[in-house]
């Protein structure tokens, strides 16, 4: 499985916390890569060391970040962790906005939370250039801008598509009764 080409930011300077659902990484990672390439200091959960206490690390980074971008999709709206990250960022009064990846039906509570700030509806832009131009208009993101990193290679969403046959040697992945696990048969 391909990893994001941008390393999570480590340091004390102002940075952007990215909230996203792992199921959406093929859409989110290319955006993170482009932003990092353009010099933005971004932290996302690939920066959690194995064996670490996940909620503490997330809360610490959300608390210390300057800004938060939440990537909104059906997947993220159905993720308890993504909703908690959004709620915590707003509770801590972080500079916040959302990037809506697809048309979604939000619960009234989430709609109320996200309506306080302007969202960017990525799926409405005809090109990545147009999208990034709009994204970078967010003035507070400029405070999280460091030196560009031209060595980062920006992926395409298809680079992150998982092929079951490549991963497991079979396309036959089934769910067993009374189990939330997936098994090969």
Which residues fall in each region the model found?
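Hydrophobic acceptor-binding patch used for acceptor engagement in glycosyltransferases
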Residues: 68-69
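Conserved TIR/SEFIR loop-to-helix hotspot centered on a Trp-containing motif
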Residues: 74-94, 104-108
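Conserved BB-loop
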Residues: 30-60, 74-83, 120-125
